[in-house]
Amino acid sequence: MTQQDGGQAGQAEPTKLWGGRFASGPAEAMAALSLSTHFDWRLAPYDIAGSRAHTRVLHKAGLLTADELERMLAGLDVLAADVESGAFQPVIDDEDVHTALERGLLERVGPELGGKLRAGRSRNDQVATLFRMWLRDAVRRVTSGVLDVVDALTAQAAAHPDAVLPGRTHLQHAQPVLLAHHLLAHCQSLLRDVSRLRDWDARTAFSPYGSGALAGSSLGLDPQAVAAELGFDGGAVDNSIDGTASRDFAAEAAFCLAMLGVNLSRVAEEVIIWNTAEFGYVTLDDAWATGSSIMPQKKNPDVAELARGKSGRLVGNLTGLLATLKAQPLAYNRDLQEDKEPVFDSVEQLDLLLPAMAGMLGTLTFHTERLAELAPAGFTLATDIAEWLVRQGVPFRVAHEASGECVRKAEARGAGLDELTDSELAATHPALTPEVREVLTVGGSIASRDAHGGTAPARVAEQRERVVATVAGHRQWLAG
């Protein structure tokens, strides 16, 4: 396409979207402070998509002729291709992504036609819309990564249906559980993260485009048409002031991402502990571990440690954004230039972390013999004695005391609960007949916990099936 009034892309004079009321340009330090292309340039494809939709509503409102519509859209297509290829880039004097792209459009269609695109829109409604568009796409990408992590955990659960380990509270041995049950517990929290992100998307699927600076447009434009073209399922926002000024969608996304980071950090912390020589639960695959520059024997769980560290970064991004948003009056304020970087960073960190977490978790080697050895340690079957007594009609208060006395006796002679003699059991409580031994094994304990959600093998198999089905449903949403 022939360049008009500006030569090659990137060589025209920088464009300001304001200035008629000013006798001089901004001071150098002022311009430097205002610059945002170093982080908002990623919004360029969304800005151009918005400009295409805006061009069409300008034509429908009679503000562009059919010929102008065709030439404007052609110019935007060329600009989009040049942005994608890198042929067009912002220059130092471009204040933001909007300014840079207007300069690029003027270079391609000329100032007379290109200048008409600004009618009926403001950077305020533009950036609020573009940010939503970018973030909705980013959330879908993050969601896919979370589901990959869930798939890795589910695959490990399927590969170890009978493996047992000591379940813990306060990091102390509590009750034996299936390894699959434990891994699927992490799946549940991660799937809630996905549900939160989907709920967030439903609230964010409204377009501020057409809100103008704050009061809406007087030019007969159709915000609903723009919303439909840009993929906003909810249509246009109901209040133009709210549309340009509100960033709760960004804060909510930052929370969802921070909560996801916290949940990932819990998985990561367990891998770090399990990988120690003292625990010896797992061995990391070489591809997902690192060594030491001085200690040849080291095999470090860096993926898990970075997950733990980055979770704090995500929480920091959330709190920083909330502090920025606090007490801003309606409508738009320049403080909102600071709304994007924390969210951009959170997404970037998860884009890096999620594939690594899925890879690390999916390739863990579990030492099931070690897990089975430790499962009954620490008197983890004590609760089974108490509940067995309850099933014999003994009040739980009494049963709890009797079970505690069994622990005391076993501990005193360095034995396990299953090693107490029949006479020792009967002396503790007359209802402790030899039949209690059916729950004094790890397998018996686990099999007895067959209520919904419990650790019995049949219940855990059901849980895994539901997780797999839930993941499939979320992937169907992503595909749609």
Swiss-Prot record:
Annotated region (Disordered), positions in chain: 1-20
Record GO cellular component, one term: cytosol
E.C. no: 4.3.2.1
One Pfam family this sequence matches: ASL_C2
Pathway: Amino-acid biosynthesis; L-arginine biosynthesis; L-arginine from L-ornithine and carbamoyl phosphate: step 3/3
UniProt xrefs under InterPro entries: Arg_succ_lyase_C (IPR029419), Argininosuccinate_lyase (IPR009049), Fumarase/histidase_N (IPR024083), Fumarate_lyase_CS (IPR020557), Fumarate_lyase_fam (IPR000362), Fumarate_lyase_N (IPR022761), L-Aspartase-like (IPR008948)
UniProt subcellular location: Cytoplasm
Listed PROSITE patterns: FUMARATE_LYASES
Keywords for the protein's UniProt record, in alphabetical order: Amino-acid biosynthesis, Arginine biosynthesis, Cytoplasm, Lyase
Family: Belongs to the lyase 1 family. Argininosuccinate lyase subfamily.
The protein, known as: Argininosuccinate lyase
Gene that encodes it: argH
